[in-house]
Amino acid sequence: MDQREILQQLLKEAQKKKLNSEEFASEFLKLKRQSTKYKADKIYPTTVAQRPKNIKKNRYKDILPYDHSLVELSLLTSDEDSSYINASFIKGVYGPKAYIATQGPLSTTLLDFWRMIWEYRILVIVMACMEFEMGKKKCERYWAEPGETQLQFGPFSISCEAEKKKSDYKIRTLKAKFNNETRIIYQFHYKNWPDHDVPSSIDPILQLIWDMRCYQEDDCVPICIHCSAGCGRTGVICAVDYTWMLLKDGIIPKNFSVFNLIQEMRTQRPSLVQTQEQYELVYSAVLELFKRHMDVISDNHLGREIQAQCSIPEQSLTVEADSCPLDLPKNAMRDVKTTNQHSKQGAEAESTGGSSLGLRTSTMNAEEELVLHSAKSSPSFNCLELNCGCNNKAVITRNGQARASPVVGEPLQKYQSLDFGSMLFGSCPSALPINTADRYHNSKGPVKRTKSTPFELIQQRKTNDLAVGDGFSCLESQLHEHYSLRELQVQRVAHVSSEELNYSLPGACDASCVPRHSPGALRVHLYTSLAEDPYFSSSPPNSADSKMSFDLPEKQDGATSPGALLPASSTTSFFYSNPHDSLVMNTLTSFSPPLNQETAVEAPSRRTDDEIPPPLPERTPESFIVVEEAGEPSPRVTESLPLVVTFGASPECSGTSEMKSHDSVGFTPSKNVKLRSPKSDRHQDGSPPPPLPERTLESFFLADEDCIQAQAVQTSSTSYPETTENSTSSKQTLRTPGKSFTRSKSLKIFRNMKKSVCNSSSPSKPTERVQPKNSSSFLNFGFGNRFSKPKGPRNPPSAWNM
């Protein structure tokens, strides 16, 4: 158990005991019985104190020091001096003579008292009583008041150099002189502690002990503590200070007990902690110490977590282009020049994420890695997560730690979201060292930065003048041209060149900044973060399901259809129709910024599953429109350009430029349009799934009665015999239990469009089109058109008389 758990357990026990006062009474009764047994059985004898010549030196007859812990005086100033004084050594945390518990000096023992102070080189004296209490003399005055002449006690001269007044005690600076040697002694005089009673508050006692340890931190010399008899109030201070030392050094044992502590102290001097009220006071003081120390531990633990989360392992800070290397000391004040450099770099880093987005570094899956080759491999460093409002307070240091240091002239601010260390290292208080050559599984990848910013938002897309209906008509015609082929092959792209990737996104940067084949590898790990369709989905765009994927049907054996094996590019959805037999990536949504080739950035290598991507702007109806050149055919994709960017090492992507292809692809209408990473990529050792049977044009639509009848008339007069076969197989496929298609709320708007596609005639015979009576423009959203046909069986029985 660590100190935090031990303290929590002790706090619970002490709080339970405080609620039940009978436990205090029973425990203190045990202590009194134990002391009585010691005295009756003479387990700890007091032979020296009971000698006739020493009896007059004892203030109380029943408070006598034990022989085994007696303080003996060897410093002799005259022939009348003896070695006896009513004082006892009390064990401390690190030694058997940490405290000297003694009685208040008598008029006959003032010289003995200063002999003891001088011989044992006492630095701090704690006085817990008044000179007079209840009309009785409790302690002779052995100190001098400020401004008074020095007091003479035999050969000792005592004067007061200064006095510092506190609310409940005074701190006097005494100067003692003996044989031309002068020493400074500090006296802590507590004045508000009544005899056989307790103070009204424990805060002054704790403050007294705190100040006492400020003057003397260790137990190299004993601390002299006395009251009137040197047992009740003296024992309270010894017990509280003993516990304080354990807490300060973090060595509270599991079996710590106030009862055991006082019981042990009572074996060294009788009647320490003399009353039950004083015993309860010790418990209250110890409980308060535990609470305060728990707060300190919690603050330190939180500080270590923040330091661990902000730790930035770096190997070098060599910056390319015009920037100069950074050299920041760890614990020194930054000069104005260094502060300006960091402010400039913080402004650059802050501008990369825009006003609402932050640069998030997170772990990612291996199949989502893309490796870009740069001209040189310069030393890299990790980017701290930059969140709005606190990203300008990160200071990168040489030793790999980022300390929250405010800019000169600005107030301190709290970090609002420093939680990516919890995602990466869990609850570990310290960050793991990151090696760029052999990374830990959940570690961050190094990020290279050059003069330009890591990411740039793409330029605004030109406003499309086409209406929503024209956009869907264009999409309909394009789909019809695709589905007129006998089969649609979607080849899985294993390597996508950075030039083609930037070509597919408008406003791409100059590709000449980053050569394609250079020895230094610059890793850029992308992940797809597309929002769902805000028009056809009830879930918010920034939900956890916002990753783009195609919801494709899975086979019975659990394998994903080949259509799911699409390349995971940054927020792009591809239509594989290129008149030049090349792969064109038509961007449907481009909310995330593209890769800037001028910037050499290496993002994290892995991504945790529970991290939510940053919020994206809402989509507009124009974003669904894909504009292609009119009149160009859409042949089958049979080849692609040579590619440079590679996915993570998996059986499908082996690091070569050869592409894997699949025979067919199956699409299913889904609630959203997503680009899901295939299961075969998640398991790198698994084999690719087998291809699905060939799909036909009509199998991609939900067939109804009018569509089937119109298709029968159309296929009887068309010149494509294989279309008829595909239509028959499509109907059979729709009735197959294992190949059923799910309906989606987001595709209800396409119902009339599907009818028009199904009932449109072949392009070779435009004059023989058979239009169903219910066919109309899909832009007519009237109630009668939406619910014109009753729900029921395909062939209603004759009893219905329809």
UniProtKB/Swiss-Prot annotation:
Residues 536-546, 713-744 have a biased composition (Polar residues). Brain (at protein level). Spleen, thymus, lymph node and bone marrow. Induction: By lipopolysaccharides (LPS). The modification Phosphoserine is found at residues 35, 452, 634, 680, 687. It comes from Mus musculus. It is found in: Cytoplasm. Its main location: cytoplasm. GO terms for molecular function: kinase binding; non-membrane spanning protein tyrosine phosphatase activity; protein tyrosine phosphatase activity; SH3 domain binding. Phosphorylation on Ser-35 by PKC/PRKCD abrogates its ability to dephosphorylate and inactivate the SRC family kinases. Belongs to the protein-tyrosine phosphatase family. Non-receptor class 4 subfamily. This is Tyrosine-protein phosphatase non-receptor type 22. Pfam families: Y_phosphatase.
